[in-house]
Amino acid sequence: MAHIEKQAGELQEKLIAVNRVSKTVKGGRIFSFTALTVVGDGNGRVGFGYGKAREVPAAIQKAMEKARRNMINVALNNGTLQHPVKGAHTGSRVFMQPASEGTGIIAGGAMRAVLEVAGVHNVLAKAYGSTNPINVVRATIDGLENMNSPEMVAAKRGKSVEEILGK
């Protein structure tokens, strides 16, 4: 979670984890590096990437490219979530709920990075089970993908937005 930088198209990039891995062969061990990154525009678009290479910069670059290719749109509501959501991936489960203005991002580790680049400013979040960064990122993105805006719900049910919101 070291750096965040702006780039062309105003995408925010965050490095979540770099890990050294090894492959054991007859002549010894071959070391390589993995990098986990998230990319977002700060306005509801977010993606993650996982890259692997013999050198750290190459692994980060691969991860950033994959993150830019795998972006999703998230329907935010004034810098917070539409409603409480749950996400899961393998052993990781996350719970996120909207928070009032001024609360900030109350989330740990990898989940915080995803929410920051997605453009969420106020949220209460908790990770349960495995806290493996890759699985937490996937679970967070799963939860954000499953979130519906009132417009989406109204379209699915064939009702007006006012009926859905109870106004």
Swiss-Prot record:
InterPro entries, A to Z: Ribosomal_Su5_D2-typ_SF, Ribosomal_uS5, Ribosomal_uS5_bac-type, Ribosomal_uS5_C, Ribosomal_uS5_N, Ribosomal_uS5_N_CS, Ribsml_uS5_D2-typ_fold_subgr
GO biological process per UniProt: translation
Protein name according to UniProt: Small ribosomal subunit protein uS5
Gene Ontology CC terms: small ribosomal subunit
Species name: Shigella dysenteriae serotype 1 (strain Sd197)
Protein purpose: With S4 and S12 plays an important role in translational accuracy.
Free-text domain note: The N-terminal domain interacts with the head of the 30S subunit; the C-terminal domain interacts with the body and contacts protein S4. The interaction surface between S4 and S5 is involved in control of translational fidelity.
GO molecular function terms noted in the UniProt entry: rRNA binding; structural constituent of ribosome
The keyword Ribosomal protein belongs to this UniProt entry's keyword annotation: yes
UniProt domain S5 DRBM: residue ranges: 11-74
Alphabetical UniProt keywords: Ribonucleoprotein, Ribosomal protein, RNA-binding, rRNA-binding
Recorded family membership: Belongs to the universal ribosomal protein uS5 family.
PROSITE patterns the UniProt entry points to: RIBOSOMAL_S5, S5_DSRBD
Subunit composition and interactions: Part of the 30S ribosomal subunit. Contacts proteins S4 and S8.
Origin superkingdom: Bacteria
NCBIfam families in the cross-refs: rpsE_bact
